[in-house]
Structures are given as structure tokens and as C-alpha cells.
Amino acid sequence: MGKTFSCIIILLASSLCFAHKATAGIFRSDIVIAGGGTSGVTAAVQAARLGASVVVVEQTTWLGGMLTAAGVGAVDGNYNMPAGLWGEFRDSLAAHYGSLEALKTGWVSNVMFEPSVGNRIFHNMVAKEKGVMLWTGSEVKAVSHNGNMWAVHVARPDGQTDTVEAKVLVDATELGDIAKMCGVPYDVGMESQAVTHEDIAPAQANNIVQDLTYVAILKDYGRDMTMEKPEGYNANDFACCCINDKCITPKEPNRQWPKDKMVTYGKMPGGKYMINWPIEGNDFYANMVDMTPEQRNEAVRKAKAHTMRFVYFMQHELGFNTLALADDEYPTADRLPFMPYHRESRRIHGKVRFTLNHMTDPYEQAQPLYRTNIAVGDYPVDHHHTRYTGEEQLPDLHFHPVPSFGLPLGSLLPQEVKQLVVAEKSVSVSNIANGSTRLQPVVMQIGQAAGALAAIAVKQNKGVDEVSVREVQNVLLEAGGYLMPYADVPKDSICFKPCQRIGATGILKGKGVSIDWHNKTLFRPDAVVAWNDIAGLAEVYPFAAKLLRHDEEVSSVDTNGQSVDGQSVDALSVDALSVGDALSLVAAIAKQEKLMKRSAAMKVMASLAKEYDFCIDDRQRKIKRGELAVLIDGVLHPFEKKQVDVEGRFVR
């Protein structure tokens, strides 16, 4: 095959400018992003690359959020789907450490890194974008909207309050605090089965969130570094964190590991160790979502103390007395990260709600949300609840299997509030689905999509809910992103983009599989095309239904009732399409859609076959799925020409 057939949307325009100071204490920008975390930084970079001016407001001095400021230097999932800016970040890590193999130091992830290195990479990415103004050590205190512009009031490190006026506001905060300020309805905790229709959801809703973790980054000093016994220390709190003599009744007997495996779980390059241990380790329960600032500070204090008691247990009881908090990782007084690792936030009521059912059976739902995907993931549903001590019966959500999945654009859009895009872990997903969508590569893609959506809205002077789904998707695809979570069509494949685009129309559908930790969706580009494989063609082109019937009485016909190639479909192939069938079908649809005459379509398909390196001379040969995707994409352009709304339905 040859190069991909695609069109690149260029959004750079003179109407978009850098953020600037209008009057004393008032700045103007196209976009304000609250939060410079995992999604905030990618939103800023993507928006700036599309020509928008951006102000990023971040409470800490670091960029990257859970990946850096919270200490989770271990990327979960998407190793084989390096989508967009997540792929750029991974490549930058590999360049820093020497290779992708050099990142495989711990067994929890194939991408391990020191948080400080990740922070520098994110700062470098932002520094390259001249349209980004970065305000660190700053916090959004209030927001208002006058019908045209947002006024975002920001407390600065010097004690002053500055205001940024912007057309679009992006909430990339850790707990969705801006969405709450804006009056967006939201959920906290687990929804009931009646709400989400998920079989494994609880019968009754509750407000239980996942455990958070205050991560510790340790290093080996080569000498005894045992700390003083912390206040409130009780060895029984951690006795069953691993296999050891103190463990009598483990909460999770099937998840017991030797102590050395516990430590190497999060081994980082540079000889450091991430302590983010979920099995009776330093997970900590605190529902901080709706707490006051004072209550949050107290919860953070308790979470830190819990982690330090666990570090002492490791030193004193397990013999790891040469390990202690790294003195060259965080510039904090206590050497701990800037913030806890939040696994769950408030989740907005969005234009759509993404659930476990959309993950497991994307093609069987009332809303075909897969057509609107803007991010992909392949991590199982992973919930942490071992430190919760309430009486409620919680569903067993330890790595519930799912295939790889895509996240819809409508999950970033609140139902009512205009010109607000919500990112990070506050998107409109169910509590159960959040167990997969919360992981770092997905959240980075969410941010990139938020930035693209915001920038396009500014450029086109539209509401964020008026922007074409396909336009956002095309920008992401051209930026190296994935729309469909195909494991067998890698990004460097020559037919990657055609397969992505055709997959997003539903004309050819993927097949989800989950085997152990291998969660995949397969496009099967080299498989022959069965007739039922292209039932989706009639969803895009309703008149094509008659072309897909192949019983004894119905021939392959064009819409004027004429035989396309002089033979009935059955005469050519009952079970699978031949090359001749495919050419005839595509040519007939092109004619009906008034795209081109049959002869012109045949010429285009001959050119595409040459370009993409496959042969169409043997009309009896069974055509492959990847080949058919190229022909449909290159002649009919259904992705570009058949627009969809945020629910995935075609706009007729």
C-alpha cells in the first residue's frame, strides 16, 4: 500500500493571538485551562498548536499532575496504542533514558520514569508553544460568564488576584472543582444499576469513591535510613502487604507477593522506587470531592502520615532499612509529592454518559457513541477499595475484563453550561467505567481532545457544542491520535488512517477480545470480507441495503435497478466479497451519491490499489478488510461527508 488518503485541517489563523494584558490585572486569552495536570498540559499544547492563545492556571509549580506532581511515574496501559501527545511523551522518555526498553524497570508498567523527568518533559513541551502563558503557583477562585466571555479570577503567588477573560474554559482540575463552580450537575460515587444499566453496578447508589494514594518515591542510600517510629504506627495495618511472618489473615489471599516483588513493582530508572502499593499498603480512603479546603488539607495530612507509617513498616519490619524518601526528587519540605494520587473525581452529567456497556458492546447500544471517539484505552476496570471500612457491599471490580475501548466526545461536554469543556477524570462516565478511563494515557488524550475542541470553537466562533465531531476527530487523527482502539493496525501502518476513519463510521466493525491482561479490539485488516461484515454500509447509505441482499432472487444492482456487473451477487460469492463485488458496490454508491461516475470511480480505485500496494486485477479474489477500507475511504469519503452528532447518529 502507499501513503494515506486524508485531508489535513489547518487551523492556524491571524484571528488567534497570544494571551495579552488588557488593563491592570486583566488579561485576555482565547482559552483558559484550569489545571496543568495530565489532561491540562496536553489540552494546552494541542490548543496552541492549532493557533489559540492559552492561559494555564496550575496550583503547583509542576506540570503533569498524577504522572508527576502525584508521583505516579508508571503509565498504565496503551503501550501498543501510543496515541497523540501520549505517544510524544513516551518517545521523549525513551530519548531521555536511551530507549523504550530502558523504561521497563518495574513490573507494574512498561513505561516507568522519575516524576521529575516527566515534569521537565512537560515543561519543555509547553515552552515550545508560544501561545501558552503558564501561571504556576496559582489557583482559580471564581468564574463568571456574561454570555460571551468567561471571567476567571485567579489568586497569584504574589497575593494579587488577576482576571483572565476568555472565550472557552477547560476544567482540567484533579477533582472537577471548576465544573462545580459553573453549576454543572455531577455524580460522586457509584450509580445504581437503574441509572447505568450495568450488570455489575450496585443495586443502590452510594457516595463511595476509590481509595487515593499518597505516593512515596524512595531511593537506596546504601546505609541504615530507618526513620523514627511515626505517631499512630500499628504494624497490623500493613501486615499483609506481602508474604511475611506477620500476615495471618490477608484481605486478598490471592494477591500476596514476596516482599522483593512488592518493592520492584514500582522500580524506576535511576534506582528509585515508586511506593504506590494497593495490597494493604499505602492506599487511603478519603472522599475529598466536596470537602472544604480545610478539610482537604486535613485529609492530605492523614494520607501522608499513613504513607510514612507504611515506609516505616517496610524499613523496620521487612528489612528495607536502606530505602528512604529520595532527596533529589521533590522540592518539598517533606520530600513527598505535591499532591495525592486521586483515582476518582466528581463526574459531570454530560451530553452523553459513557458506561461499561459501551466498553464491552459498543455496537449493540442505543447510542452508537463509538462513532464519536476521541480517545482510546486498553486497561481493565481497576477499582481500589480495600481501605474503605463501611458496611456497604461493593462489587468486585479488581481488573474486571473489558476489550480495548474508545471514549466519546460528548463525555467532555456538560449538558447545559456553554463554552465549558471538562477533562481529567471529571468527564461524563459511570463510576465503573472510570476504573478504566481514569488511567494516564486516556486522560492525556482527553486533554488533547479538549484542547482541539476549544481551539476549533474559537477559530470558527462557535459554541463548543456546535463544533463538528468529525472535525475534532480529524484534527486528532492528523496529530497522531487514535479514534478506534485497534490493536492490529498500528499507527505506522500504511492503512492506519483509512481503517480508523472507516471504523469510526461503523461500515466495518472491530471485534473486542479480553484475554488475561491483553485487552484488544481487532480490525482484522487481512481477513476476507464476509457479506455480514458490511451490514453497516446500509446505516451510512440506506439505499445500499438492496445492494447487500444476496439471495437467489436478488442481484447486485445499482439504485436504478440495473445489474452492476452483469452477475448476481450469489454468482460471485455467497460468503465473502470478491474484488469484483467490492469495486461494483463502491462504484454504485459513488454514482448514487453523485460523487463521480462509475468509470471515474473505477479509475480512482485502480489508483488507490497501486498507491496502497494491492492488486484488483483478479476480480474473483476475495477482498481483504483493509483493502475495502481503503477503497471506501478513498472514493466515498464517508467519514468526512457523513457527519454525526454527539450521540453518534448520522446527521441527515
Question: Which residues does each predicted region cover?
Answer:
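Conserved N-terminal/central alpha/beta ligand/cofactor-binding core
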Residues: Q46, A52-S53, E58-A142, N146, ...
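Flavin (FAD/FMN)-binding glycine-rich loop and adjacent Rossmann-like elements that form
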Residues: G137, A155-V168, A172-V475
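Terminal recognition/anchoring or ligand-binding modules at protein termini
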Residues: A504-G561, D565-R652
